[in-house]
């Protein structure tokens, strides 16, 4: 066991997570079509403050993230402060760590709490895959800049004459890694091949995710942590996530064709997480501040770790790298955990990480550790389903996982929970949570 790094303030206070909330998650171009991420963020933070009954002036900092950023609102965090009636002097800034963005937001607020610069803050994230920053071609962009500098009409017309029809076509946001040109699904296909993960295994995990998420909603386990969203034209509110396939059968998954490697692939739309709209946030405080306000925390942040690996091959192995580090810093092992929640970007990615967490060879030869991190107990793993079922608004997923895991830990009488995710750029995140 390496160095334990307790997450406490100088006064010995633990970092308390007192409340968490999210919007329902909606598939791209469905219930939240036309609603930008900044409005989803305002929606969830406003409702979170109202439900918690914590005076807005108690919140001293808001750290929020957005992966698909809109040029007109580059600092989503500040817009949320200004749009929710919070104190105008509340510090607010935005972060982005791809699919681990709200993990980063939580870590940043925790660091401010430990430094003593604040006693309470909000962390979270929002994304919309339905309201996208559609750009222009590089040639058109350059001409538009030059036209702005031109002094005469003839100069402007000459510049425009350089353009061809193809230069006028809109440019959607990139879906591939900037440094490699690989799409996420291409990486998932790499991982399926590298680690011998079959189509049947991927479909089975996806089916499990949907079945468990549907059961969680049916049992009323998500009611406290998911708000009702009222959206224009206000005829029908959105109450639940709309991606979950509660009535599907395992045989249905086999009917879909591969989405990335059309000829030899195993990754399909059904065993991958869909493009999704939504927002999620949590309130963090020092333990003593929560007591002052008479609040009973959902739980505590015990440790966290962020890692990075090469992007060319199997780059979605973040959980296999960050989990041992987070456990080490928490002074725990896999066997100490009550729950494990891993982000399901793709079934192939999820199964590869599970495989490597239990691999002695990977631990020795790649991580330089004496022993494997530990086998993943299926009875503890993604017990309420995962991102394949719920969906994945990039910046909101971490906050969803944290809130969901803490509520489930409390239902089970407390214990330790691990939440972990891969992210674009070869990044990984893991956090250990504790509930009493």
UniProtKB/Swiss-Prot annotation:
Pfam families: Thiolase_C, Thiolase_N. GO terms for molecular function: acetyl-CoA C-acyltransferase activity. InterPro entries: Ac-CoA_C-AcTrfase_FadI, Thiolase, Thiolase-like, Thiolase_acyl_enz_int_AS, Thiolase_AS, Thiolase_C, Thiolase_CS, Thiolase_N. It is found in: Cytoplasm. Disulfide bonds: none annotated. Pathway: Lipid metabolism; fatty acid beta-oxidation. PROSITE patterns: THIOLASE_1, THIOLASE_2, THIOLASE_3. Keywords: Acyltransferase, Cytoplasm, Fatty acid metabolism, Lipid degradation, Lipid metabolism, Transferase. Signal peptide: none annotated. It catalyses: an acyl-CoA + acetyl-CoA = a 3-oxoacyl-CoA + CoA. The active site is at 99 (acyl-thioester intermediate), 392 (proton acceptor), 422 (proton acceptor). One of its GO terms (biological process) is fatty acid beta-oxidation. Transmembrane segments: none annotated. Its EC number is 2.3.1.16. One of its GO terms (cellular component) is cytosol. Belongs to the thiolase-like superfamily. Thiolase family. Catalyzes the final step of fatty acid oxidation in which acetyl-CoA is released and the CoA ester of a fatty acid two carbons shorter is formed. Heterotetramer of two alpha chains (FadJ) and two beta chains (FadI). PANTHER family: ACETYL-COA ACETYLTRANSFERASE, CYTOSOLIC, ACETYL-COA C-ACYLTRANSFERASE. This is 3-ketoacyl-CoA thiolase. It comes from Escherichia coli O139:H28 (strain E24377A / ETEC).
């Amino acid at each position: 066991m390496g160095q334990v790094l307790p997450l406490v303030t100088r006064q010995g206070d633990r970092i308390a997570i007192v409340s968490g909330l999210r919007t329902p998650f909606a598939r791209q171009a469905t219930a939240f079509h036309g609603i930008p991420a900044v409005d989803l963020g305002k929606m969830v933070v406003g409702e979170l403050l109202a439900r918690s009954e914590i005076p807005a002036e108690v919140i001293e900092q808001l750290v929020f993230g957005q992966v698909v950023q809109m040029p007109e609102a580059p600092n989503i965090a500040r817009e949320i402060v200004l749009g929710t009636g919070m104190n105008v002097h509340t510090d607010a800034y935005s972060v982005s760590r791809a699919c681990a963005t709200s993990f980063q937001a939580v870590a940043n607020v925790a660091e401010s709490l430990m430094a003593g610069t604040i006693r309470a803050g909000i962390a979270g994230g929002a994304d919309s895959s339905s309201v996208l920053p559609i750009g222009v071609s590089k040639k058109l962009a350059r001409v538009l800049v030059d036209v702005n500098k031109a002094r005469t009409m003839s100069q402007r017309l000459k510049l425009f004459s350089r353009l061809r029809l193809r230069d006028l076509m809109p440019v959607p946001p990139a879906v591939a890694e900037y440094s490699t040109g690989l799409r996420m699904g291409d990486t998932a296909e790499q991982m399926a091949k590298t680690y011998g993960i079959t189509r049947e295994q991927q479909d089975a995990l996806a089916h499990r995710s949907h079945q468990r998420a549907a059961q969680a909603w049916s049992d009323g386990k998500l009611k406290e942590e998911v708000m009702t969203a009222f959206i224009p034209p206000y005829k029908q509110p959105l109450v639940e996530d709309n991606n979950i396939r509660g009535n599907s059968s395992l045989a249905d998954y086999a009917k879909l064709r591969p989405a990335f490697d059309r000829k030899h692939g195993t990754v399909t739309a059904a065993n991958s997480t869909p493009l999704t709209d939504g927002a999620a946030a949590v309130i963090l405080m020092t333990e003593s501040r929560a007591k002052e306000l008479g609040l009973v925390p959902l739980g505590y942040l015990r440790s966290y770790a962020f890692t990075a690996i090469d992007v060319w091959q199997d780059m979605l192995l973040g959980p296999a790298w960050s989990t041992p580090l987070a456990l080490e810093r928490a002074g725990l092992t896999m066997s100490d955990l009550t729950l494990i929640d891993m982000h399901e970007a793709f079934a192939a990615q999820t199964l590869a990480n599970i495989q490597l967490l239990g691999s002695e060879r990977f631990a020795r030869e790649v991580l330089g550790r004496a022993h494997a991190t530990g086998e993943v107990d299926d009875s503890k793993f993604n017990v309420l389903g995962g991102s394949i079922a719920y969906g994945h608004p990039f910046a909101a997923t971490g906050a969803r996982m944290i809130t969901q895991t803490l509520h489930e830990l409390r239902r089970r009488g407390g214990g330790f929970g691990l939440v972990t995710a891969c992210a674009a750029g070869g990044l990984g995140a893991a956090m250990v949570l504790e509930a009493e």
